[in-house]
Swiss-Prot record:
Binds 2 [4Fe-4S] clusters per subunit. One cluster is coordinated with 3 cysteines and an exchangeable S-adenosyl-L-methionine. It comes from the Bacteria. Belongs to the radical SAM superfamily. Lipoyl synthase family. Its cofactor is [4Fe-4S] cluster. Its EC number is 2.8.1.8. [4Fe-4S] cluster 1 binds at C74, C79, C85, S314. This is Lipoyl synthase. One of its GO terms (cellular component) is cytoplasm. It comes from Paracidovorax citrulli (strain AAC00-1) (Acidovorax citrulli). It is an enzyme of class 2 (transferase). It catalyses: [[Fe-S] cluster scaffold protein carrying a second [4Fe-4S](2+) cluster] + N(6)-octanoyl-L-lysyl-[protein] + 2 oxidized [2Fe-2S]-[ferredoxin] + 2 S-adenosyl-L-methionine + 4 H(+) = [[Fe-S] cluster scaffold protein] + N(6)-[(R)-dihydrolipoyl]-L-lysyl-[protein] + 4 Fe(3+) + 2 hydrogen sulfide + 2 5'-deoxyadenosine + 2 L-methionine + 2 reduced [2Fe-2S]-[ferredoxin]. Keywords: 4Fe-4S, Cytoplasm, Iron, Iron-sulfur, Metal-binding, S-adenosyl-L-methionine, Transferase.
């Protein structure tokens, strides 16, 4: 079986418009790697997703989101669990627009020059959450390297508005790395710390140049460690994808690094390429291997480990948090 190769060179076959939202090939045309696809691996039988159904809340949720001009990472990143989650009335809200300043070649979120922040978004988000009567919400964002605080102030405004309208709702935030602005961002977040702090490492450090250009493995670890030092009572969380070319030992080492940086909760799921323009799947991890990861996670001291092919960082996030010991109601 042939193996896909990643060649570091500029791609210039797709016209680039910095003002437009770039997806797939257009988004990846200007990163210094070119993905050479080998033989496409056949999806194994354990990869199964549930499509949205008109008999569920799937379309109701989509309509409410459009009405309030909100985005979800479920839609923007083409999450395979969108049918199940929307059908159960849950979603991961994506704030600060739908154009990311990064071009990670595993991710399906669009790239481009971001729009100005919507000053009404925090209140619109809070009203939507109140209307849906959600008890647990996940708030994430695109990377906003154009903002002096990396968008941390906008996160705080969203948290404060949600708590004003839905004081019993628990809030998990899935943040970018606030590159070069982490100390400032953490200081700003003191005004309204979340109930769970999540930032994904995504993959092993060896693969960062290909998978997370512009990011730094140690920087991401330190972000969560610094937050934990400031808020020891707030659980910290991170996630990893498998299938990008890493080894099992590399995954276990990432897990050890997480625990060494006081990360409490862990998610591990199978990477699925959003398109042929994205990084290819280099292996499908067997359920037995996922079980091994889970067992090792608890041996290392994680309070909760959600591990499986279809697990994503915010998939069943409420169940993950409560299984880890998060008590009902905001943590303050």
């Amino acid at each position: 079986m042939s193996t896909p190769e990643v060649v570091r060179e500029a791609q210039s076959t797709v016209a680039y418009n910095p003002l437009a939202k770039q997806k797939a090939a257009a988004k990846l045309s200007r990163i210094p790697i070119k993905v050479e696809q080998g033989e496409v691996l056949k999806k194994p039988e354990w990869i199964r997703v549930k499509a949205g159904s008109p008999t569920t809340r799937f379309y109701e949720i989509k309509e409410i989101l459009r009405e309030h001009k909100l985005h979800t990472v479920c839609e923007e990143a083409s999450c395979p669990n969108i049918g199940e989650c929307f059908g159960k009335g849950t979603a991961t809200f994506m704030i600060m627009g739908d154009k990311c300043t990064r071009r990670c070649p595993f991710c399906d979120v669009g790239h481009g020059r971001p729009d100005p922040l919507d000053k009404d978004e925090p209140l619109n988000l809070a009203r939507t959450i109140a209307a849906l009567k959600l008890k647990y919400v996940v708030i994430t964002s695109v990377d906003r390297d154009d903002l002096r605080d990396g968008g941390s102030g906008h996160f705080v405004e969203c948290i404060q508005n949600i708590r004003a309208l839905s004081p019993a709702t628990q809030i998990e935030i899935l943040v970018p790395d606030f590159r070069g602005r982490d100390d400032r961002a953490l200081e700003i977040l003191k005004a309204a710390p979340p109930d769970v702090m999540n930032h994904n490492l995504e993959t092993a450090p060896r693969l960062y140049k290909e998978a997370r250009p512009g990011s730094d493995y140690q920087f991401s670890l330190n972000l969560l460690k610094k937050f934990k030092a400031l808020h020891p009572g707030v659980p910290t969380k991170s996630g990893i994808m498998v299938g990008l070319g890493e080894t099992d030992e590399e995954i276990l080492q990432v897990m050890r690094d997480m625990r060494a940086h006081d990360i409490d909760m862990l998610t591990i799921g199978q990477y699925l390429a959003p398109s042929n323009s994205h990084l290819p799947v280099r292996r499908y991890v067997h359920p037995d291997t996922f079980k091994m990861y889970e067992e090792e996670a608890y041996k290392m001291g994680f309070t909760h480990a959600a591990v499986g092919a279809m697990v994503r960082s915010s998939y069943h996030a409420d169940q993950q948090a409560h299984a880890a010991g998060l008590q009902a109601g905001p943590q303050g």
